[in-house]
């Protein structure tokens, strides 16, 4: 196949949702239906030996939440699907944001009982800012849930886009009878069962078929009235509007019962776009170009604790990747020849010989690659859009056993480069390392990982700081003067970018007034010392 044909087969998407909407379950079931796994690990059965394929880190298995993004590749209907499962917990929104820069579409999972929740809205704003097409799956229809028309209205008002139902529920909760496929004019009957595939599903054709009315009575009467209303009032599906992020196709189902999953998988193949062009600072990079380019959007330490390794997750932007090819790291101008490159089914790795635009490949390395790095066959390119946000919570960290100080620094350096936490080193000698986070759970996860992956018992101590701003100035003397005058508040992050740490916004306002030549930034690009203040 040509590069163009290979690119046309690719679909790369992320699954996003509020915590507990059933995202990890749906991820499992998509893998099951595509034939990538034989048995889905129930996320609820955490104490059993079976765990969700996409929740592989020890703390995820214990707590039943996704805290690191997982990457999985599978083939379905002659398409290569790259599925990125993201953390649902709000404390990990930065990691989710980084994943959303690497995909061409998003699958939004909504809990039918709760509707559109705050975390979903934040993630959707990121998708909207990038014009990422969104497919919506309304989950848990076999529970007591809200009215479907109400849910549609909520999606439209919160997301600012038209919701176009492709299927519609007949009943809900205990009286959930199935979903009616509006486009194919047939009803798929619901039968509970977690290990069931769709091979033996029962269908009844035709909205006006008396058989359906006979079997489902009042529930179908209500559903058919709603479907008629939708056919008259809702806009028709427009593929161009979907690709522009102005329409979202909506599906209903119950992921835990494998119901409605097939339709979503088919929609991903039929509707989601193939990889598109990506804008670098220097030029537009097209996926069908013969030369390889790729961007590191995630670094994960200790995917294999036995080897203490770090894997850089690279989204291929153009060309064809071949194992052993010579690549240039644009940030350092250094050359590398990765030989043991892998593709993923969560933590299960397979050696990879080639990859094309849209694919996500893993390059094991020992700190050579950082978040935001661009890999090319020689060209100097810079991609932006992979930010660190200024943390809002701070804790000092100390090691209980002074003999483990080196391991603490190694662990925090790796976790900081991975983006799991922000690590600040005080300018004043002898000060404790400071950790910065956007949510409290990040500290717990880091303490747990330091213990299990690096053998370090760390103490987290309260900090007087509540705010950080990276500092720059076009006048080096003005910057030095500011740093000398505020030495006790200056610290350096993992790329040695200087930051000003303070306890209140009032302190920031005073500093801005006293030092007009110094700029205070709420955001830093992962690619290095590139700063900004907004998304």
Swiss-Prot record:
Keyword Protein biosynthesis: yes
Pfam families hit by this protein: EF-G_D2, GTP_EFTU, RF3_C
Span of domain tr-type G: 8-276
Residues engaged in binding GTP: 17-24, 85-89, 139-142
Major subcellular location class: cytoplasm
One GO MF term: translation release factor activity, codon specific
Gene3D superfamilies reported in the protein's UniProt record: P-loop containing nucleotide triphosphate hydrolases, Peptide chain release factor 3, domain III
Example GO BP: regulation of translational termination
Subcellular location as annotated: Cytoplasm
GO CC list: cytosol
Keyword list, A-Z: Cytoplasm, GTP-binding, Nucleotide-binding, Protein biosynthesis
Keyword check for Magnesium: no
Function description: Increases the formation of ribosomal termination complexes and stimulates activities of RF-1 and RF-2. It binds guanine nucleotides and has strong preference for UGA stop codons. It may interact directly with the ribosome. The stimulation of RF-1 and RF-2 is significantly reduced by GTP and GDP, but not by GMP.
Family to which the UniProt record says this protein belongs: Belongs to the TRAFAC class translation factor GTPase superfamily. Classic translation factor GTPase family. PrfC subfamily.
Protein name as it appears in the record: Peptide chain release factor 3
Gene name, Swiss-Prot/TrEMBL: prfC
